[in-house]
């Protein structure tokens, strides 16, 4: 068009085309953090398909060590977070007879992300449930920990409503004293919504680009309306 926003190409296939196989576009990357190595399946348009993004890297560095029981990786993308948690759990507790229970649930709205997430679990010999869900609409049960690098884009457009709706509903999916840990760009002050809708919130760490927040799923005390920053 005149604004050079798009172009149209027309061609004719003369040879017999190869049958479409989704796995032809699948890639596998090895990530490493704090002596933990894990495999991640990727595909075009899937978040973190090429490398561990800086925000998720900061989040994983500051996750609690005692994550167990039911864990939700919300907006999981390729399953980077859940796979790290699962592999670290196996590394921390090598004896299966003395290993605490860990049940991973991975949710996303994006079909290719869900496909990659399932592949990522398989690559790391992990068990988990991969759930197609618009926000938390199809996610069932309550979790001891919800972990996320929530999206704030829909396509190429900025959309803060995704994270806001998630935070409004998150406490209903946490057990009492359950934890919600997320990373966000520093200019996105999710702590206010976390404090209001989830429970007492603190900033675990921040740099010049990202901040990691953690909230505890209880009702705040009267007058408690300011998140705490760890000293």
Where are these predicted regions, by residue range?
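SAM-dependent Rossmann-like transferase core, predominantly class I methyltransferases
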Residues: 4-68
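Conserved class I S-adenosyl-L-methionine
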Residues: 185-198
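Conserved SAM/SAH cofactor-binding pocket of Class I
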Residues: 54-148
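Conserved beta-strand signature within the Rossmann-like core of class I S-adenosyl-L-methionine
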Residues: 177-184
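A short glycine-rich, Lys/Arg-flanked "PGG" loop and its adjoining helix->strand segment in the class I
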Residues: 164-176
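A short SAM/SAH-binding and catalytic strip from SAM-dependent methyltransferases
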Residues: 145-157
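Core SAM-dependent methyltransferase catalytic element
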Residues: 7-28, 206-231
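Conserved S-adenosyl-L-methionine
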Residues: 1-4, 41-43, 200-208
